[in-house]
Amino acid sequence: MNALLSNPFKRGLLRGETQIGLWLSSTSSYMAEIAATSGYDWLLIDGEHAPNTIQDLYHQLQAIAPYASQPVIRPVEGNRSLIKQVLDIGARTLLVPMVDTAEQAREVVSATRYPPIGSRGVGAGVARAARWGRVENYMAEANDELCLLIQVESRTALENLDAILEVDGIDGVFIGPADLSASLGYPDDAGHPDVQRVIEQSIRRIRAAGKAAGFLAVDPAMAEKCLAWGANFVAVGVDTMLYTQALDRRLAMFKSDSAQPQEKTSY
């Protein structure tokens, strides 16, 4: 195994280890490197809701590379061409949002693997991931080391969860709390008891199927719940939210008329 392609995050999931992560939404390679020095097991670079370009994602991968924290990229959608670009710039772990059916899951699996087992386009000679053609046996090893996580975040996805979990090539399933709570009729209220019950049941179903289960919890108490339910890759904060909260707390120390800092419990 070429060390450049080795995926410690995937290895940790296979061993059943609990890995704690942080969401990166600032689009800044400088902020990404600061986060990488903190010691989180994984760092999610958000290309869905944060205004990241492919170049932005590329620069953040470069910034994180010297450190132990493992990057995970979330593309804006499970588009085949977009997935190809993200993998070519060096992503080894993807979190693909809005997967509602087993058929969608199979399409994403295919897009992330080279032929004959998938349909990923071949361009290793111009790809950072293959060090511009210098990594021997790149295509076979890239298939083996790719870690694919998908997001289940709608009522439809929950109805299809068992079928999704049977799809080969998926390493983990991530429960998207914000979109899921909205889909269930509780927008911006992932803490509602009905939503909490569904989250717990889903995490337990995912783990029972032999897959890793993931979650984003900006509320530490919710993170602890998810870990207790069996989630084993959990993001415990969002960089932009932590930054705004710290700014508000500091200002409130010196200006009595400033707005009191609010601790959000949802993303």
Swiss-Prot record:
Binding site for substrate: 151, 178-179
Key words of the record: Lyase, Magnesium, Metal-binding
Binding site for Mg(2+): 153, 179
Gene field: rhmA
InterPro entries: Aldolase/citrate-lyase_domain, HpcH-HpaI_aldolase, KDR_aldolase, Pyrv/PenolPyrv_kinase-like_dom, Pyrv_kinase-like_dom_sf
Protein name in the entry: 2-keto-3-deoxy-L-rhamnonate aldolase
Highest classification ranks of the organism: Bacteria, Pseudomonadati, Pseudomonadota, Gammaproteobacteria, Enterobacterales
Magnesium in keyword set: yes
Substrates-to-products reaction catalysed: 2-dehydro-3-deoxy-L-rhamnonate = (S)-lactaldehyde + pyruvate
GO CC annotation: cytoplasm
Site (Transition state stabilizer): residue numbering on this chain: 74
Cofactor(s) in the UniProt record: Mg(2+)
